Amino acid sequence: MKISTRLLFMAIVFLLGSTMSCNKSENTSGTDDLMQSLDNSVYHEWVQVFLELDRYAAFFRPGPAPRALAYLGLSAYEASLGGMPDYQSLQYKLGISDMPAIKKNLYWPEVINASYAYLMTKFFEDVTFKDKNGNVLSKQDFLNLIVNKERELKAKYRNDASEELLNNSEAHGREVATAIWRFSISDPVGHNAHLNPFPVPVNAQGCEWIPTDPITVADRGLFSQWGKVRRFAVTQGDLDALISPYTCNSDTNSVIYAQAYETYVVTNLARKEPKGDMEHMAEFWSDDRVGWTFSPPARLEAIADQIAKEEDFNLEKTCLLYAQIGMALSDAAVICWYNKYKYNVERPITYIQREIDPKFTIPWLGFTPPFPAYPSGHSTFAFAGVGILEAFVGGSYPFTDYCHQQRTDFNGHPRAYNSLRDLANENAFSRLPLGVHYRMDYDGGNFCGILTARRVLQLPWKR
């Protein structure tokens, strides 16, 4: 009798345990999980969507793209703090007045999924999409990429969490994203700047910058007001910390002549060897053309995505990475464009045609970007992005960039580097064989980018 009673008791315990483990409505998977225990795949999925939209978004480069990345990363970070006990909100530091309360016991991948879906729709809903020939593409097709990705991921998460838990997580992600969107649109210069990309005339005097490409309004530069966009970490003092560029001078012994001549020589070397390393470098890092590739700042997001996957960062670490690199790239655009229009340095093609070779042209790309030269945007973005990435993987991290390995319309063969700083240096230098920058632009971008990354890392992230 005692044996039978004991067996009956064990059978009941077994059945109860089996029922509870199989009952999906009672599944609390994720409710007690911190972000550290989860994988980062939700970020990879959304980065790929962003890169596809960014590639075809007209007048979304170079400023609006990193600005969007900053708010996307910030929103996901703020929404996920309930699963990141070592980190704190930046609400008061940034001046966000109506941030929802931190919530715990949510399924964090769905929180991030909902946040990205809401904000990405908001940032791209008024954008015109064009192919590389300038033909307007269906906006709805691109917005559907967002809708479909959100649905796809939520359906996937039903294998891990109950419907109630997913709905609560989605609601919180959207609530935080809505607050971040209100914060975004309160920036009068940055909000919807892509709808008026040539806002004010630029009055060139002497040998200051003048437009050199056919798409630029005759007396206006692209995003000439971007230096007034809201910043996340960089101060006004930081904006003015960049040293003055070398002054315009026709003397063949002047520094600016030597720098222009270097660009002239390096560009012609690339032109003479269309399959050589100089040309490969120039094409590989260009990312200038809408419809061809994603934008130069988004390139650093793509590199971050590759590193996060290769190193298998957990969800908390990845969340922090994208919050920080987004802010750094956004502030990099502000400090760079502030100084571009502060100094109005003419492009090398203008100086070279006037002082060195009137027949000089830009190889491969065929045009110079429609804004002043100093400092270089590519350089600033590269060093800002790398400055953040080094905080996660160190200064001696070897890296191979596969961003364009499938391309056949230009040389996208992967390039390998001994460190991320080497990558940033090559990205910056690549603008010389392309013929669009001086070496001082590269150096100025180095200074601005590293300073920007340092300021973002100094924000009070940790409790």
Where are the regions a protein language model picked out?
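Hydrophobic helical h-region of N-terminal Sec-dependent signal peptides
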Residues: 9-16
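C-terminal motif of bacterial Sec signal peptides marking the signal peptidase cleavage site
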Residues: 18-21
